[in-house]
Regions:
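N-terminal secretory signal peptides that target proteins for export/translocation
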Residues: 1-13
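Bacterial N-terminal signal peptides
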Residues: 19-29
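Sec/Tat signal peptide C-region and signal peptidase I cleavage site
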Residues: 32-36
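Primary mode marks residue(s) on the alpha4-beta5-alpha5 output face of response regulator receiver
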Residues: 37-69, 76-187
Length: 187
């Protein structure tokens, strides 16, 4: 009897919220058209110096993320967000993004971003742009040998401005972003 790998299990668990995210993706399609094309554009984005990546690293994968930032009310403020998102590329859905922060590809690779990230607020109505150092990239595929991850061109995703109704109240706030994954170049 064949057993499921952790990647297969994660993708199965994702199926519960995937339809919602696909709906969000369709709504975000017009916003995505104004941004770089993930399928063909592996140029590094123009970013503030606080989140720039050194020149000895090059973009090897660029995906468009659509999902939610999940906040929980602790009685006095909204707690740190946990993402649930999918990443799109020319071939369609290529990866999922979840707590860690972790990205897991259909090709079998996984990368976790080191916390805390370098962050800069570009749009006061959206979650910050980030640069994360990659830790523990695993498996063959698009996230293999990743050194840095950037989240840029963000829309939405900010914690609600109103207080939660009760301790434990959960708010799922839609967001979109471009994600750039870097590898070190050999010189």
């Amino acid at each position: 009897m064949k057993t499921k790998t952790s990647l297969q299990i994660q993708w199965i668990q994702t199926s519960a919220w995937l339809p919602t995210l696909v709906g969000l993706a369709l709504g975000a399609a017009s916003a995505a058209s104004a941004l770089a094309e993930p399928a063909t554009d592996n140029r590094a984005p123009e970013v503030p110096t606080e989140i720039a990546v050194s020149n000895d690293n090059k973009v090897h994968f660029h995906g468009f993320g659509v999902g939610v930032q999940i906040y929980t009310w602790n009685g006095s403020s909204w707690g740190t967000a946990v993402p649930e998102a999918i990443l799109f590329h020319a071939e369609g859905v290529v990866a999922i993004h979840f707590a860690g922060p972790t990205w897991q590809s259909k090709s079998g690779s996984t990368v976790v971003g080191a916390l805390p990230p370098k962050a800069v607020t570009v749009d006061p109505n959206a979650i910050p742009w980030l640069r994360l150092d990659a830790k523990s990239p695993e498996g063959p595929g698009i996230f293999a040998n990743t050194t840095f991850i950037q989240r840029v061109n963000t829309t939405g995703g900010k914690a609600p401005s109103a207080d939660g109704a009760f301790v434990g109240h959960v708010a799922r706030v839609p967001y979109t972003a471009d994600y750039f994954f870097y590898r070190q170049t050999s010189n």
